[in-house]
């Protein structure tokens, strides 16, 4: 993500520079319209669709819990409105972190323009990954997925989600959708846009797939693992930008990165390949949320394997490029050292007769008569 330059001059209203400088305020005004809609009876029902989770069903509470009923959720068309509103919230939070945290650090550290772009990108992702890891781990613990791992492939009831599970997925979709307008707001370079689009698209594809196929617990576990590895990656980048002596941390991150991909593959294969295949139903129907069909299993497993192979290949190519660049830099440094040593030898009189050598006595000036 690029760094916005704030000029002291006020740009014309509705100009491109005006929108870039004040996009957070503009988005806040749009969000306020939905909040003000709650005040009036005629628009309250429409505003609630954007602000709260939709498609809920009341089910009886368990016997060991308190009497009454609890609400479970499924997905539907109205979720698009909720995702849109929280996408606006993500844009506002993004601008707040950029202005009040990252921009102040940039001024203190006095980074170059290239480092500013990398620092801003790593800073934004670090905050998001850190918050998502804590939130996702809390959901896994509260829904007993760690104490009962079978819940990873068994949702009860099959096509329903709890409030916190659905809100987590809505928030994730909103964040990654907000990354598209941020490419414009942050003045991303044209050569970086394809890489960013692939990165955003892969996250949206897998999060949406887990959400629509009701693989909520499996998707949540894989997201936590993935976000943890990415968090270490961007944290190492932040330390490296602040001081290049932390370059060894990047090598440590590469090991954790490979291990994280292996764990993700193992969990995916065990869950999708064995457990879903072992509980084959006679009349599966993916439209009702039952993903225990051959096409869905092959799609989920192949998608997980493909993305892990793609990301790992990118890491290998990146390290090969760095290795080639480092070797070229070392070769150029050796040439410079050799040229400097040869110059010193010539200056010291090695192979050349000169009176400026150290071991030669200085010439005495002849007195004029």
From Swiss-Prot:
Q: List the membrane topology term(s).
A: Multi-pass membrane protein
* Lumenal domain ranges by topology: 51-81, 143-164, 216-219, 271-297
Ranges of biased composition (kind: Basic and acidic residues): 360-369
Specify the protein name. Translocating chain-associated membrane protein 1-like 1
Residue span of region Disordered: 335-369
Q: Which family does it belong to?
A: Belongs to the TRAM family.
Gene Ontology terms: cellular component: endoplasmic reticulum membrane
| InterPro entries, sorted | TLC-dom, Translocation_assoc_membrane
Domain TLC: residue ranges: 117-326
> What GO biological process terms does the UniProt entry carry, in alphabetical order?
protein insertion into ER membrane; SRP-dependent cotranslational protein targeting to membrane, translocation
Give its localization: Endoplasmic reticulum membrane
Q: Which organism is it from?
A: Homo sapiens
Q: Which UniProt keywords apply?
A: Endoplasmic reticulum, Membrane, Protein transport, Translocation, Transmembrane, Transmembrane helix, Transport
Q: Which residues lie on this side of the membrane: Cytoplasmic?
A: 1-29, 103-121, 186-196, 243-249, 319-369
- Known function: Stimulatory or required for the translocation of secretory proteins across the ER membrane.
Pfam families for the chain: TRAM_LAG1_CLN8
Chain segments annotated as transmembrane: 30-50, 82-102, 122-142, 165-185, 197-215, 220-242, 250-270, 298-318
SMART domains the UniProt entry points to: TLC
Q: What is its main location?
A: endoplasmic reticulum
